[in-house]
Design a protein with these regions (language model features):
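Basic, helix-initiating cap at the start of DNA-binding domains
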Residues: 1-23, 27-36
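Generic detection of well-ordered alpha-helical segments
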Residues: 6, 10, 14, 18, ...
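Short amphipathic alpha-helical segment with a characteristic S/N-K-E followed by hydrophobic residues
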Residues: 27, 50-55
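Short, hydrophobic secondary-structure boundary micro-motifs
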Residues: 29, 100-105
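Residues within the helices of the helix-turn-helix
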Residues: 31, 42, 52
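Short hydrophobic/aromatic patch on the recognition helix
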Residues: 37-48
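Hydrophobic alpha-helical connector segments
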Residues: 57, 61, 71-96
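Amphipathic alpha-helical packing segments from all-alpha helical-bundle domains
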Residues: 86, 94-97, 110-141, 155-159
Length: 168
């Protein structure tokens, strides 16, 4: 009878995050995750079909927290600036927490196809809290995409908002 390991999925994700921080995306493997958690390779594959699926889950779990924080900022504000500021802070924090993935050439190559699939979803999630401040759907999505692009490019919030505020 197989042994039951409490919170194994969380342990696998924690181990992956730790290995990425210490050694980078390229050095982390399903085998190294299994070894770090004291389980067989097949056990890891029961939870994650591939290394990239494991990484995607790691990123998704953190992103859910970002979306919750943005939602809270949105529901507590009658003006767009605090909401956009929260989005900016969540995006910069997210990238900083996962820079070993985002700025790794092997990871970029592995995830190149996924980026286009998730771009619309990401833009839509960021546009959602902006819709009530905008006159139409396109403007909310345009602001979301602009904020995402310029935040990822390392631009200062005040400079970005100076332009975006003209669209509200």
């Amino acid at each position: 009878m197989p042994k039951i390991i409490e919170n194994l999925k969380d342990r696998l994700l924690t181990e992956a995050k730790q290995q990425i921080e210490e050694s980078g995306y390229g050095a982390m493997t399903i085998r190294s995750i299994a070894k770090g958690c004291g389980v067989g390779v097949g056990t890891v594959y029961n939870y994650f079909p591939s290394k990239d699926d494991l990484i995607a889950e790691l990123l998704l779990e953190d992103w859910k927290g970002c979306i919750q924080a943005i939602g809270a900022a949105s529901s507590g504000s009658d003006a767009p600036r605090p909401v956009v500021r929260c989005m900016y802070e969540q995006l910069t924090g997210y990238v900083r927490r996962h820079e070993k993935i985002f700025y790794d050439e092997a990871a970029a190559a592995a995830f190149a196809g996924s980026v286009s699939r998730y771009d619309g979803l990401l833009r839509g999630q960021l546009a959602q809290p902006l819709r009530r401040f905008c006159g139409d759907e396109f403007t909310a999505e345009f602001i979301a995409e602009s904020l995402l692009t310029w935040t990822m490019a390392g631009k200062d919030f005040d400079r970005i908002y100076q332009i975006l505020e003209k669209l509200f």
